[in-house]
Design a protein with these regions (language model features):
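Extended, domain-scale alpha-helical bundle/helix-rich regions
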Residues: 75, 82-86, 90-103, 110-111
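Gly/Pro-biased beta-strand-loop elements
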Residues: 148-235
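Soluble, acidic/polar mature domains that operate outside membranes
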Residues: 7-40, 115-147
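Single conserved hydrophobic/aromatic residue that forms the stacking wall/gate
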Residues: 2-9, 13, 270-279
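Solvent-exposed, polar/charged alpha-helical surfaces in well-ordered, non-transmembrane soluble domains
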Residues: 71-79, 115, 119, 123, ...
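Second-shell loop/turn segments in exported
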Residues: 58-67, 103-112, 149-152, 214, ...
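Exported/periplasmic cell-wall-interacting domains
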Residues: 74-75, 187-188, 202-273, 277
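Cell wall/extracellular polymer interaction/catalysis modules
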Residues: 105-185
Length: 279
């Protein structure tokens, strides 16, 4: 009957109208997404994410819903990370003795939190605004300049068996130390490490030792700086045959001064270089 036909036709028209409305809505949504600009502030540089890149991530499914390619967003974040992350990347250090060394190991440095940054981009796209911000970091460093470590760090020179503690560019203290016993295969590894935590009155234990210390400052697993009052001499060649299990053994007064100055996250730059003494 004609009635059935007209009813079917009106369903089709209704469907078309709904689709048109949905289509217009999804076009609006896409325009809003493409109008988003995120300017990343890296201090020494800025990176801009805008519609040109964003449009590559957008598509519409069969039900006319906007789909964002999260893999595409993630690969953008990975590009940012490979450009601006500095953890595990080589660092040049002009040593306190004047020479320049490369420290090529260690977790210290900027590190973008990829999954959280993807989530933040998706939120920014939904909001459709122009924003300027830092990326979401899993880990931060002192500086975005040429050297990410800035001017606050402990410089631990394994060759000279001497360390320097700098805070805001000022030398707070320096001291001889004894590091890991080279002859027994306990040489202290070089690298850029953060202080994991610090604690008073710890007992350090290993398979064949138990050492009570007053100031314990680990930075690389169970390797750290601490006082060792049973040692009467520090520096020189002691470490080669009578060194520690890997830790940086310090005179009590130096350990105390360092402990009072540094906190969790403070940087230790450990390197091997020619032991030319200052002066």
């Amino acid at each position: 009957s004609t009635h059935c036909i007209s009813s079917a036709a009106s369903d089709v028209y209704k469907r078309q109208e709904d689709d048109n409305e949905k289509l217009l809505a999804v076009i609006d949504e896409m325009n809003s997404y493409v109008g988003t600009t995120i300017t990343y502030d890296f201090d020494v540089a800025k990176e801009v994410l805008d519609g040109e890149r964003i449009s590559e991530w957008l598509s519409v499914d069969d039900d006319l819903n906007l789909v964002v390619d999260e893999e595409g967003v993630l690969s953008f974040v990975k590009e940012l990370a490979s450009e601006y992350n500095t953890c595990y990347k080589p660092k040049e250090l002009k040593t306190s003795y004047g020479s320049t060394v490369t420290i090529s190991n260690g977790p210290y440095g900027w590190k973008i939190n990829n999954s959280e940054e993807v989530a933040q981009i998706l939120d920014d796209l939904k909001a459709g605004k122009k924003v300027e911000r830092e990326p979401v970091y899993a880990q931060t460093a002192n500086s975005h300049g040429e050297n990410d470590y800035g001017n606050s760090y402990v410089e631990i020179n394994l060759t000279a068996q001497h360390l320097f503690l700098y805070k805001d560019g000022v030398l707070v203290t320096e001291s001889d130390f004894v590091s890991g016993n080279v002859a027994k295969g306990h040489a202290t590894p070089g690298g850029a490490f953060m202080l994991t935590y610090k604690t008073l009155n710890a007992v350090l234990r290993g398979p064949d030792y138990e050492t009570p210390v007053t100031y314990w400052m680990p930075f690389n697993g169970d390797i750290g700086m601490h006082d060792l009052t049973s040692r009467k001499a520090f520096g020189g060649d002691i470490y080669k045959t009578r060194g520690s299990h890997g830790c940086i053994n310090l005179p009590y007064s130096a350990a105390k001064k360092i402990y009072e100055t540094i906190d969790k996250g403070y940087l230790s730059l450990i390197h091997i270089s020619e032991p030319t003494r200052l002066g």
